[in-house]
Each structure stands twice: as C-alpha cells, then as structure tokens.
Design a protein with these regions (language model features):
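Conserved CoA-thioester-binding segment of acyl-CoA-metabolizing enzymes
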Residues: 2-76
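Alpha-helical segments flanking ligand/cofactor-binding loops in enzyme cores
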Residues: 115, 135-136, 169, 181, ...
C-alpha cells in the first residue's frame, strides 16, 4: 500500500541558534521579523583583522544564505568604528606553504567577496558606524549607510601588499580607474562626502544613527511582498 510520502525528507537547513554559537567569537546575530543584524566583532570588542576573521566572514555569509528565515540582512560593526585593528598573531598559518596559504587565500579570501555577491539572494544593508578599513561586507551590500565622520582607506600598499582585492575593485569602480588607483597606491583616506559624491554610499547620517537608519529602510522593505524585495535585490 502506498502512503504517498516522499522517500526522504528535505535536508536540514541551518538554524539561527546553531550558527550563533558557531560564530560567537566573530559576530553578534539578532533577528526580528525576518530582519537579521550581523554585528562584526572579535570576542567582545572590535573585530581584529586576521585570517580567522577572513574565514568567519566568508563562511557566515554562506550559512546566512541557507537560512530562509533571513529575509533582509544588515551588516554593521560593534562600537563607533568599523574594523580598525589587526591581530598580530592572526596570520601565522598564511605562511604555511603551499597548501595552507592557498586554502586561505583562495577559499577564505576570494569567497569573502564571492559569497557576498552571489550567495545572498535577499536585500542587504551595510551600516557603517565610523572610520576603519576592511569594509567589504558593508560596501558590497545593496544599500550602504555611513556616519558623517567615516573615513576609509585601502591600506595594503602601506603593509607591503599589492592592493587589488574587493576594496581595490570597488575604488576603481566608484572613483574611476585613475582616482581609484591613486587611493590604492597612496593609501590616502577618502571621506564620507567623497563616497557619497561618487555613489559609494547611499546616505550619510549623524554619528550613532547608521544602524537606526538601516532598520528604518529594512522595515520599509518588509512592507513589500517577499517575492518582490527578494527578486529586486538580485
């Protein structure tokens, strides 16, 4: 006798309470009415740039894309700045040649950009609370809000690295090739007004208001149909 049931159930999707624990050292996750706020950090303080944070960002973004309860995502950073420090002991495995370094640079670093662009099929907002660097996740979002004191830079050249990751590509895209190259090759900072004038950010708001404004926009999107806002973000 046939009971008309499928032979196997759907594969389990990740649940918020599960991956909150997985990524607790790198992000605070809060969800309300389908709007997820991702607050980057390291332990209980500002996120420190490291191989570990690189991997956490790319992996978390991929996991978020698998949880259909995340209908809108806001990316922000703990405190009044974006990432402003580097972990002095956070890059040791990058020197382990050849396999470890390749895995870091190809799977972790490249996927940090790729996952933001291709994995997230829902509207995203970057809410930048102040100055910093490594601003990829905020500026790869559909809408980016920053505070009026925000200044950013592409610091690689100063650290002995050739610039050209997502920050470099976005500089060339928004500022133009020549001016983008100038910012990359001199590590000169660009201001909130520079970014607004060139379409790199959507709005500039007073200090302390970036996250609040991001939630206002997210709640406005929630008034649209799920299908409309989801397809619109792609």
């Amino acid at each position: 006798m046939c009971d008309n049931k499928p032979m196997a159930p759907y594969a389990k999707l990740p649940e918020l309470e599960e991956y909150k624990e997985w990524f607790k050292d790198f992000a605070d996750l809060y969800r309300e009415d389908g709007i997820l706020q991702v607050t980057w950090k390291t332990n209980d303080g500002p996120m420190h740039h490291s191989g570990m944070s690189h991997r956490a960002i790319s992996q978390l973004v991929r996991v978020l894309s698998l949880d259909f309860k995340n209908e809108i995502i806001i990316f922000t950073h703990i405190g009044d700045n974006w990432m402003i420090e580097s972990d002095p002991n956070g890059w040791e495995t990058y020197s382990e040649l050849p396999t470890q370094r390749f895995q870091h640079q190809y799977f972790d670093d490249t996927n940090l950009i790729k996952n933001m662009v291709f994995d997230l099929d829902v509207p995203t907002i970057g809410a930048v609370p102040g100055p910093g660097f490594h601003w990829d996740s905020a500026f790869l979002s559909d809408v980016t809000i920053c505070t009026e004191d925000t200044v950013m830079e592409v610091p690689h050249a100063q650290g002995g690295l050739v610039p050209g990751d997502a920050m470099g590509l976005m500089c060339q895209h928004y500022f133009g090739t020549k001016r983008g190259n100038y910012y990359m090759m001199t590590t000169r900072q660009f201001t909130a007004q520079d970014m607004l004038d060139h379409g790199m950010v959507s709005e500039v708001v007073p200090k302390g208001k970036a996250v609040e404004r991001a939630w206002e926009i997210a709640r406005m999107w929630k008034l649209m149909s799920y299908e409309n806002r989801t397809i619109m973000s792609n």
